[in-house]
Amino acid sequence: ARYESGAAMARHDADLEIDYAAGIPDSGVGHAIGYANQKVVPYKRPFVKYTPTWPRSFMPQNQKMRDLVAKMKLLPNEKLTYGKRVVFMDDSIVRGTQLKDNIVKLHDTGIKAIHMRLACPPLIFPCRFLNFSTSRSTYDLYARRIIRDMEGVDNLTDETCMKYVNPDGEKHKEMVEIMRKHLPLTSLKFHRLDDL
């Protein structure tokens, strides 16, 4: 399923010129292999994963601890990134903590272009059955915070958030562009439900 997900995203990037595809360890690896195979480009591993940390960087409740875990968890290899144009794949953006930190580290290595591909649509609605953290704030979700800022209100309704779900809609495109600039990335795309 992850290979097929990556391959589907690669079909939307037919004209994108890159040097290779890479997965954000470990959740993006399968997607990136599928992407690389479909696009017929090399798959490389430009990150070394330091495993004696939390299993998921978004799990600690304290933001300072999340930042520390994200900073320590993945280390880029400059020999594989300097001057390169790379598609990175991951499964999702939850809080955005780890992704933002990794992008800063990649820019510090002299990477030429970072094209981020996420294997699920933006997480706009929380799921109470997923026990990622004890927090119940919907604003822990990166996409939800972006929508809140775009709408300029503190109390988002589901009806308002639904305006951002359609990947062909203007609100969705504007949200993704704000995310792209904020992170900062060369390009940012999310998997579409109609490709699943």
Provide a role label for each language-model segment.
Residues 1-196:
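PRPP-associated nucleotide enzymes
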